[in-house]
């Protein structure tokens, strides 16, 4: 009976965190040092909380739920949502797996930072080979025009790969680190609620 109650709590918590993450996806804002089409949100925060509280699978499910909710209103033909899911799943999957094996503050920090690093590194080839070529086709936007948006900020970058390495790689890592920092601020107060403790 207790095991059944625990499973229900995990499923309910995962679903609720997925809904919160979906709302946070809409609360995005531009960053002055990035091209206007690159925006910051903290929608991985609930997924990271789920990954720490319930395990990596729950965190990945939160990433899936938020993107499925966002899908009907997408303007990217699901390319952006698929990218968001893959990156988020890598981030919270790595973080949750490491924390599951080492449930200490150090384990959480190492897991979150390593997850952010993996997400940032993988984002470069994913953007280079899939996302940006898809956007070029979908929006009939020349690749040179996209590169020009980066060069308007830093004229020294030449080529898409350089743009991704100089701008997107550190941005994605910092985004993950920000989610991690926020998680460490709110996780302890939320933990009793997530685990059904008073």
Regions found by a protein language model. Name each.
Residues 1-198:
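Loop-helix junctions at membrane interfaces
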């Amino acid at each position: 009976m207790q095991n059944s109650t625990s499973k229900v709590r995990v499923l309910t918590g995962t679903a609720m965190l997925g809904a919160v993450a979906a709302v946070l996806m809409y609360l995005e804002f531009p960053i002055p040092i990035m091209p206007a089409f690159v925006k910051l949100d903290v929608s991985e925060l609930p997924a990271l909380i789920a990954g720490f509280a319930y395990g990596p699978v729950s965190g990945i499910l939160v990433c899936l739920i938020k993107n499925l909710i966002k899908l009907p209103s997408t303007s990217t033909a699901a390319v952006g949502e698929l990218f968001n899911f893959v990156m988020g799943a890598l981030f919270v999957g790595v973080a949750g797996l490491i924390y599951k094996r080492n449930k200490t503050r150090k384990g959480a920090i190492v897991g979150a930072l390593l997850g952010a690093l993996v997400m940032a590194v993988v984002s470069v080839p994913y953007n280079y080979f899939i996302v940006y070529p898809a956007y070029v086709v979908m929006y009939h936007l020349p690749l040179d025009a996209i590169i020009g948006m980066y060069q308007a900020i830093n004229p020294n970058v030449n080529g898409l790969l350089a743009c991704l390495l100089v701008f997107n790689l550190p941005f994605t890592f910092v985004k993950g680190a920000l989610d991690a920092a926020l998680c460490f601020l709110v996780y302890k107060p939320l933990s009793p609620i997530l685990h059904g403790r008073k």
